From Swiss-Prot:
GO cellular component: chloroplast; cytosol
Pfam families: eIF-1a
NCBIfam families: infA
Lineage per the UniProt record: Eukaryota, Viridiplantae, Streptophyta, Embryophyta, Tracheophyta
Protein localization: Plastid, Chloroplast
Protein's recorded name: Translation initiation factor IF-1, chloroplastic
Domain S1-like: 1-71
SMART domains in the cross-refs: S1 (SM00316)
The keyword Chloroplast is annotated on this UniProt entry: yes
Amino acid sequence: MKEQKWIHEGLITESLPNGMFRVRLDNEDLILGYVSGKIRRSFIRILPGDKVKIEVSRYDSTRGRIIYRLRNKDSKD
């Protein structure tokens, strides 16, 4: 049976070494996020201030996997 995961949206507040980030979720929780393999392979750059979708396990709600970087409304890309 596959493990159930919660998907949240959050804001990157701090960049840490080795593809890790401090993420503030929309419900004001601070968690540690790491970059998923697809984002790492696609060379998608994640910077502080970016909005992301993060997948959090039910068993460890202090860590999550960043699965998508949302587009900023003011950027041209």
